[in-house]
Amino acid sequence: MSQPVVTRFAPSPTGFLHIGGARTALFNWLFARGRGGKFLLRIEDTDRARSTPEATAAILQGMAWLGLDHDGEVVSQFEGAERHAEVAHQLLAEGKAYKCFSTQEEIAAFREAAKAEGKSTLFHSPWRDTPESEHPDAPFAIRIKAPKDGETVIRDQVQGDVTIKNAQLDDMILLRSDGTPVYMLAVVVDDHDMGVTHVIRGDDHLMNAARQMMIYEAMGWDVPVYAHIPLIHGSDGKKLSKRHGALGAQEYQAMGYPAAGMRNYLARLGWSHGDDEFFTDEQAKDWFDLDGIGKSPARFDTKKLENLCGQHIAIADDAALRQEIEAYLDAAGQPALNDVQSQGLERAMYCLKDRAKTFPELLEKAHFVLTSRPLERDAKAEKALDPVSIGILNELTPHLQNASWSRDELEAALNEFAAAKDTKFGKLAGPLRAVLAGRAVTPSVFDMMICLGREETLARLKDVTG
């Protein structure tokens, strides 16, 4: 029986959830969820100067918006410092690590001299093989004994086999002279203790894997499966930055992108399943595999994001969509909907969601059901309500009062009235849009009348005709 899959997302809480981090989290989530495994969350907060509770909260909020639920409690790397130190001392006791008494000044001087002579600046500690009897009574760091020759092969599921000559690796510090563990050690110990089977992360960590493998092998632990994914670039092929647009996951929520569309788009950034562009979460979980991840950086394309978001809005459940829109309004710092507006929005959703790519677009179309009497009208709407049009609307009102208020009945009544006036319905549509929405561009007149209901429709007509 194969070992259950366990993945993890391990961000540093020094800022918001970057869009690249969000994709890394998504890949780990999809891989675990599609295999009945576990997806764990670890906050790598060992850098106490830069780690903040606010950044941790922002990361958790970003993941919650994206719907990337994790198993178990959130793990704090900082809280595991004692365990990390324990492993360093175990390696020291087993002769796989050693005490290094070289000071920062000595190491800096060595590197400066090596650089001046055109030699490698890789530091080789003079304390590696020094007997303990010759050790001074002074602070020391604990360094791992890296292999001096041979090669380390990273068997990566995305990059293929990557070979590193061991001569390129130094005796990495495990424990600083103040007793604090370094990041490289903490990551390995945490991944092992959490039972992580697959490490899916950015390819900027690829070289770290060779150094981390030294610790796994020294401890006799199984090395996890590595998959180092390419970074995300902007549309111009350069590293994603502020000039390409928003960088934080929550910024996209505040701009009104649906989470399902964002998940779909991020999944397609660097991963593919044939020619499929649009897919649901369930399909993504079933299809996602490490073999489908490419080696080249993916390019962020806002138009593709919007197109996918539009498709997800179109198929969304009306009640769920209304709830997500209300969460968007909160995230964007906009006024909340009252109960009447909320109910009206959900009732009208069927005629709003087909062509909207973002929530602001959808809410613009929903203006007719969110506004209240007396309506404010834009310039085009005011122009449509000339005296002749108002007179025609006045004549139309009795015909609507007796209609059954089904779509078929309303269409029949309006077309019959237009024929009697020797005109076409299109001539009535402009004034009716102005009356019902105060705008010239709206959903179908019939959809607006159905959503508003008889009483509100007639009241808006009366406001204009008197």
Curated annotation (Swiss-Prot):
E.C. designation(s): 6.1.1.17
Recorded catalytic activity of this chain's protein: tRNA(Glu) + L-glutamate + ATP = L-glutamyl-tRNA(Glu) + AMP + diphosphate
Coiled coil: none
Any one GO MF annotation of this record: glutamate-tRNA ligase activity
Transcription keyword on record: no
Keywords, in A-Z order: Aminoacyl-tRNA synthetase, ATP-binding, Cytoplasm, Ligase, Nucleotide-binding, Protein biosynthesis
GO biological process, one term: glutamyl-tRNA aminoacylation
Lineage top rank: taxon: Bacteria
Motif 'KMSKS' region mapped to chain: 239-243
Primary role: Catalyzes the attachment of glutamate to tRNA(Glu) in a two-step reaction: glutamate is first activated by ATP to form Glu-AMP and then transferred to the acceptor end of tRNA(Glu).
Protein name, per record: Glutamate--tRNA ligase 1
